[in-house]
């Protein structure tokens, strides 16, 4: 029995591991697993993926010499063990907090984080670039991308496999096969890996049909290997190091290994969590006030699909997060989880639309970026009736730069034929869904944020909202705030506070971001009052920029206008409220800006009420 003990908080770098024997490495794995469970139970985080790669990460740092040898963690949410072994365990108390430890690899955080990830399927292409640079510069180091079986379904990963195999350069690809991405994996490639995973002969011969998939691409295939047997993983890593050309090492792991609630998870619930009770596996959550935005949209989609057999739903590997499981159960023949394949999902929706179907593409804002060409070339250019549910629109908080949903307005605004909308509450969400599926003049995007909806009672209503028509919530007199979605609440609170001080500030619900309500804008501009636009998205190319363009195009002069939104930078992780406050997107920020504009217009005065 080993008496090995190591204070994880005192680790500076991975060099100490070279002195450990297998039994001590196994003890280290147990300590790290316990640390991860205790730490994430307080902070939340991607516990499932990290518990699954404890032994693999230890074996990698034992066999290689980071940072000289380059580890590239595809997606990056499974990099916690790597962070512990590279001297960051003492920062886990700040994991995913504002100014704290990032939940993904971060180059500025450590020399051991050689490439930043967050989205899926990028590691192999990055690795290809590194090995080409290495060989041109005649340098000597290993490049080791670690990619999951879910990420391997992404088209970018397959493009890279094709090129890497053709180049024949030295590279060791680690395929971390845990039979999951966030939700269970789908697709033919997943089925091939499943056959390899359960084959007794695959270790004994390189000529088996399934293993030949990788060998025909030009890779030496090793595996499948038990990813929780440190000694076996190290043995095969050493074998891979001696090989010439690209090697694919197939490692089979168990997501959530060592913590029963996470191990038994088949839905993806333990992929990423908030705080939880270690003893029971129950999540610690504030009392739920209302349904999530995703549920509101999904429930309305089900209602509409019950009345119209042409409605189908598509998701790129996010059925749980997008709350489409109930739809899939109700209409299995009309539900399509295409895997991590945003480009395919978008053009598939276009194809469905050409045949008179009514596709609903449920996709996170951050992942819609990956299908921009398909939106432009295949959907918008052909003016096809595709309804796009843009989930997680706006700031998402703890997941940080790679996942903030702040770019979609800017990149959709510039595409002809695109309609962009965002509801302020559940009623308006249903109305916009009904409007979108009644619209027959091109693509229709509905943005909705992460988290709970406001909790407005939904009544049966078939009211459609005319395209481009805004809602006047408070009639403007002294100034006006134009905004949409969750920032409506901030605007109303600011208007209420300013009314106490004697000012009548209008609030306009600009639920259509594109097209603008031109008639209402003309009316407001003729009042010659200060205009403040507010958006939880980028200012460049955003809603406020569209209003400015309208003002210029219509030759309005001497307009006092200001835009509040997010600056031209990537927004780091942290509490959404703290981030918003830092950019003036708060009740106080709005009040101060309105007063500043009133002073500029000469209307700032003493209280009159």
Curated annotation (Swiss-Prot):
Single GO biological process annotation from the record: isopentenyl diphosphate biosynthetic process, methylerythritol 4-phosphate pathway
Residues given in the record as thiamine diphosphate binding sites: 77, 118-120, 150-151, 178, 259, 342
Keyword field contains Transferase: yes
Known cofactor(s): Mg(2+); thiamine diphosphate
PROSITE patterns, alphabetized: TRANSKETOLASE_1, TRANSKETOLASE_2
Molecular functions per Gene Ontology: 1-deoxy-D-xylulose-5-phosphate synthase activity; magnesium ion binding; thiamine pyrophosphate binding
Biological or metabolic pathway of the protein: Metabolic intermediate biosynthesis; 1-deoxy-D-xylulose 5-phosphate biosynthesis; 1-deoxy-D-xylulose 5-phosphate from D-glyceraldehyde 3-phosphate and pyruvate: step 1/1
UniProtKB keywords: Isoprene biosynthesis, Magnesium, Metal-binding, Thiamine biosynthesis, Thiamine pyrophosphate, Transferase
Cofactor details (free text): Binds 1 Mg(2+) ion per subunit. Binds 1 thiamine pyrophosphate per subunit.
Binding residues for Mg(2+): 149, 178
Record bears the keyword Protein transport: no
Enzyme nomenclature, EC number: 2.2.1.7
Reactions performed catalytically: D-glyceraldehyde 3-phosphate + pyruvate + H(+) = 1-deoxy-D-xylulose 5-phosphate + CO2
Superkingdom: Bacteria
Quaternary context: Homodimer.
PANTHER family in UniProt: 1-D-DEOXYXYLULOSE 5-PHOSPHATE SYNTHASE-RELATED, 1-DEOXY-D-XYLULOSE-5-PHOSPHATE SYNTHASE, CHLOROPLASTIC
Protein family (similarity comment): Belongs to the transketolase family. DXPS subfamily.
Function according to Swiss-Prot or TrEMBL: Catalyzes the acyloin condensation reaction between C atoms 2 and 3 of pyruvate and glyceraldehyde 3-phosphate to yield 1-deoxy-D-xylulose-5-phosphate (DXP).
Protein name stated in the entry: 1-deoxy-D-xylulose-5-phosphate synthase
């Amino acid at each position: 029995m080993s008496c090995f003990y190591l204070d994880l908080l005192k680790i500076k770098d991975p060099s100490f591991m070279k002195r450990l024997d297998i039994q001590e490495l196994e003890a280290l794995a147990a300590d790290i697993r316990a640390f991860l469970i205790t730490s994430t139970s307080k902070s939340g985080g991607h516990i499932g993926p990290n518990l699954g790669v404890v032994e693999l990460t230890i074996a990698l740092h034992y066999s290689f010499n980071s940072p000289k040898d380059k580890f590239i963690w595809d997606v990056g949410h499974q990099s916690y063990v790597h962070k512990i072994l590279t001297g960051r365990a003492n920062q886990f108390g700040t994991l995913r907090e504002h100014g704290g430890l990032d939940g993904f690899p971060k180059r500025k955080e450590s020399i051991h984080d050689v490439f930043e990830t967050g989205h899926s399927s990028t590691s192999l292409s990055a690795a290809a670039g590194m090995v080409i640079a290495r060989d041109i510069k005649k340098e000597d180091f290993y490049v080791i991308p670690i990619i999951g079986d879910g990420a391997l379904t992404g088209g970018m990963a397959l493009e890279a496999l094709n090129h890497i195999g053709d180049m024949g350069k030295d590279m060791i690809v680690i395929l971390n096969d845990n039979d999951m991405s966030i939700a269970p994996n789908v697709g033919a490639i997943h089925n091939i890996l499943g056959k390899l995973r359960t084959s007794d002969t695959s270790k004994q011969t390189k000529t088996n049909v399934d293993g030949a998939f990788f060998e025909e691409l030009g890779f030496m295939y090793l595996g499948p290997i038990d990813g929780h047997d440190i000694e076996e993983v190290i043995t095969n890593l050493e074998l891979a190091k001696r090989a010439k050309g690209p090697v694919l090492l197939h490692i089979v792991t168990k997501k959530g290994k060592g913590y029963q609630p996470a191990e038994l998870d088949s839905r993806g619930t333990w992929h990423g969590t908030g705080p939880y009770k270690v003893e029971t596996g129950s999540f610690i959550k504030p009392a739920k006030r209302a349904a999530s935005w995703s549920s509101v949209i999904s429930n309305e989609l089900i209602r509409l699909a019950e009345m119209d057999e042409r409605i189908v739903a598509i998701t790129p590997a996010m059925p749980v997060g997008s709350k489409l499981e109930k739809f899939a159960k109700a209409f299995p023949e009309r539900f399509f989880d295409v895997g991590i394949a945003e480009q395919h999902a978008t053009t598939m929706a276009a194809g469905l639309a050409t045949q008179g179907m009514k596709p609903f593409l449920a996709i996170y804002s951050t992942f819609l970026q990956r299908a921009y060409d398909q939106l432009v070339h295949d959907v918008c250019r052909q003016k096809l009736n595709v309804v796009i549910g843009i989930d997680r629109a706006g700031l998402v908080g703890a997941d940080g730069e790679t996942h903030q949903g702040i770019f979609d307005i800017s990149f959709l605004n510039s595409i002809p034929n695109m309609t962009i909308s965002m509801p302020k509450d559940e009623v308006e969400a249903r109305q916009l869904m009904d409007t979108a599926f009644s619209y027959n003049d091109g693509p229709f995007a509905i943005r909705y944020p992460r988290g709970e909806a406001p909790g407005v009672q939904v009544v049966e209503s078939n009211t459609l909202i005319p395209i481009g028509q805004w809602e006047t919530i408070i009639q403007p007199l002294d100034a006006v705030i134009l905004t949409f979605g969750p920032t409506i609440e901030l605007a109303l609170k600011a208007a209420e506070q300013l009314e106490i001080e004697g000012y009548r500030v209008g609030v306009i619900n600009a639920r259509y971001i594109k097209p603008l309500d031109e008639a209402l804008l003309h009316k407001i501009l003729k009042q010659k009052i200060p205009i403040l636009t507010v958006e939880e998205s980028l200012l460049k190319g955003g809603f406020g920029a569209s209003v400015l363009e309208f003002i210029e195009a219509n030759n309005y002069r001497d307009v006092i206008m200001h835009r509040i939104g997010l600056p031209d930078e990537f927004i780091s992780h942290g509490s959404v409220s703290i981030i918003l406050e830092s950019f003036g997107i708060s009740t106080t920020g709005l009040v101060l800006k309105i007063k500043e504009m009133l002073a500029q217009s000469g209307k700032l005065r003493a209280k009159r009420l």
